């Protein structure tokens, strides 16, 4: 039987920009995506720590090394610049999966990898 498991998490990312009238959803620095094991176009669950909003969207690959986490389109209405978010990706598996997690500081620099 297949279950859904957490496979990747970017913990405590800071929203750096938002733009409502834009095609897309969440843009993540390509370097951070790689470290967390998240791919462009992948479905993610985003939890806003500041306002408790939760939303599902897809990932846009951002500029490598920019440290940007940007909300676009309707998702931009669910967070503000400076809000801290948790970004999670999941997978189907018939056995438990060990999630890859990166923890960020307020400048979106990696402070811990698990």
Swiss-Prot record:
Q: Please, one GO biological process term?
A: alanine biosynthetic process
Ordered alphabetically, the record's keywords are: Autocatalytic cleavage, Cytoplasm, Decarboxylase, Lyase, Pantothenate biosynthesis, Pyruvate, Schiff base, Zymogen
Which residues are responsible for catalysis? 25 (schiff-base intermediate with substrate), 58 (proton donor)
The entry's substrate-binding residues are 57, 73-75
Q: Which reaction does it catalyse?
A: L-aspartate + H(+) = beta-alanine + CO2
Q: Please provide one cellular component term from the Gene Ontology annotations of this protein.
A: cytosol
User: Pfam families this protein is in?
Assistant: Asp_decarbox
Instruction: Write the Enzyme Commission number(s) for this entry.
Output: 4.1.1.11
How the cofactor is bound: the record states:
Binds 1 pyruvoyl group covalently per subunit.
Q: What does this protein do?
A: Catalyzes the pyruvoyl-dependent decarboxylation of aspartate to produce beta-alanine.
Q: Which family does it belong to?
A: Belongs to the PanD family.
**Subunit structure comment from the entry:** Heterooctamer of four alpha and four beta subunits.
Q: This protein is called what?
A: Aspartate 1-decarboxylase
